[in-house]
Each structure stands twice: as C-alpha cells, then as structure tokens.
C-alpha cells in the first residue's frame, strides 16, 4: 500500500530492495506480521532497528500512508476491506518475496480434534495459496 507521494507509487510490482526503509510504516511490536516483514527485509539487507511510525492496526497504517509519502506492507487477505477509490495504492511485491507461514499450535492433550480439523480446513479454504 503506497502513498501517491512515494516514488514507488508509479510501479505495479515492487522489489523489497527498492523500498526505502525510512519510508516503511510497520505494525507495532508483538505482531507476528511485523516480525515477518522485518525478517523479509533483513534477508535482503540490513534493516535499521528503529522506525518513525508504528501502529497496532493495518487500518491505522494505511491512514498514516494516506497522509504521508510512506508505504506499508499489508496481507493480500486485507485487500477486500480497502475502499475501491484507494485500490490504485495497492502494489504487488515482486515474485518470490510474498509468502507467510500460518501454523496451528495445539497442546498434545487437547482432545477436541474435530474442532482443530474444522479450523484447519477453514484456514486452508480461505487463505490464498502462494503462487509459484
């Protein structure tokens, strides 16, 4: 999700290496998506240990981007909640950089396996499969 004021706005696909990290707005500490974005960026290059903007919600991140020249990374599943008049701000990350891990962790002593199966089936049916 890229501000029209950001130099990357004109692109359709963005490489992680092209993101100016000082323009990246991320979720606050304790959010697994934040950790995955930091891991992704660190895999490509050194990432600073502090940020100017952090937030606890994707909606707030997008509002910050709307009022600045920044950008943020949002999951594909959030796109359906973005107003149509802001779809021009949606850009794809370059192929190969955009996967997330989803895990279901359960205690070994948990006996309601049918609930776990239903949850797992629901997740699998609703999460986009990574495109190779």
Where are these regions (language model features)?
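Flexible hinge/capping segments at coil-to-helix
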Residues: 2-24
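Thr-Gly-centered strand-to-loop micro-motif
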Residues: 3, 27-28, 51, 74-75
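Secondary-structure junction motif
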Residues: 8-10, 23-44, 112-120, 130
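Beta-alpha-beta core module
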Residues: 11-12, 18, 56-109
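Short beta-strand-to-loop elements that line the ligand-binding cleft
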Residues: 26-27, 47-57
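Short helix-capping segments at alpha-helix termini
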Residues: 44-47, 85
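Hydrophobic "lid"/C-terminal helical patch
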Residues: 102, 119, 123
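Periplasmic-binding protein-like
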Residues: 124-132
């Amino acid at each position: 999700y890229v501000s029209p004021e950001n130099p990357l706005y004109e692109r359709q696909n963005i490489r992680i290496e092209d993101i100016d990290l000082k323009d990246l707005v991320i979720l606050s500490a304790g959010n697994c998506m934040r950790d995955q974005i930091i891991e992704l960026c660190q895999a490509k290059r050194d990432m600073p240990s502090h940020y100017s903007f952090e937030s606890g919600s994707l909606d707030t991140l997008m509002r910050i981007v709307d009022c600045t020249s920044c950008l943020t990374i949002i999951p594909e599943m959030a796109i359906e909640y973005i107003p149509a008049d802001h779809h021009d701000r949606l850009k794809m990350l370059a192929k190969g950089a955009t996967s997330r891990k989803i895990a279901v962790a359960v205690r070994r002593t948990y006996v309601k396996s049918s609930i776990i199966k239903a949850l797992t089936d629901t997740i699998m049916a609703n999460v986009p499969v990574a495109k190779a």
